[in-house]
Amino acid sequence: MGVTKKPDLNDPVLRAKLAKGMGHNYYGEPAWPNDLLYIFPVVILGTIACNGGLAVLEPSMIGEPADPFATPLEILPEWYFFPVFQILRTVPNKLLGVLLMVSVPAGLLTVPFLENVNKFQNPFRRPVATTVFLVGTLVALWLGIGATLPIEKSLTLGLFSIK
């Protein structure tokens, strides 16, 4: 490594940078080539070696072995498709289900036009965007949990009954 230069606090350039909050990297070791050529590859190769070692020493199965003669009772999609699956499962008309799925990104595209986002950075000062996010998250969680239940309990999550 190189010789580390001590900061001179009487230096006017350093004082100006410190006043702006930019003086932390003015003196000391440079990031190039010390960090980028020597330290980062060691960290990356060490991470790969640790993952490879764990995979060799403690292999884990990725699901059950395939059995073509045993079909599951209910076939479910991957977890990230649960809300879409629930919409298609509960809506009786296929066209209406597809329109509901298309309305989600279409509704999200209208949010910037409903509210001036450049004006405020705090999410609590953007009530439309915050409300759309919170309601969308709750609906997605509700639909995702409901997709794992039988169709009779899927809309209410079994909390109450609809007759």
From Swiss-Prot:
UniProt xrefs under InterPro entries: Cyt_b/b6_C (IPR005798), Cyt_b/b6_C_sf (IPR036150), Cyt_b6/f_cplx_suIV (IPR005870), Cytochrome_b_C_euk/bac (IPR048260)
> Where does the source fall among the domains of life?
Eukaryota
What Gene3D superfamilies does the record point to? Answer: plastocyanin oxidoreductase (1.10.287.980), Single helix bin (1.20.5.510)
Q: Name one GO biological process term.
A: photosynthetic electron transport chain
Annotated GO CC locations: chloroplast thylakoid membrane
**One GO molecular-function entry:** oxidoreductase activity
Q: Where in the cell is it found?
A: Plastid, Chloroplast thylakoid membrane
Q: Which residues cross the membrane?
A: 36-56, 95-115, 131-151
Functional summary from the UniProt entry: Component of the cytochrome b6-f complex, which mediates electron transfer between photosystem II (PSII) and photosystem I (PSI), cyclic electron flow around PSI, and state transitions.
- Name of the featured protein: Cytochrome b6-f complex subunit 4
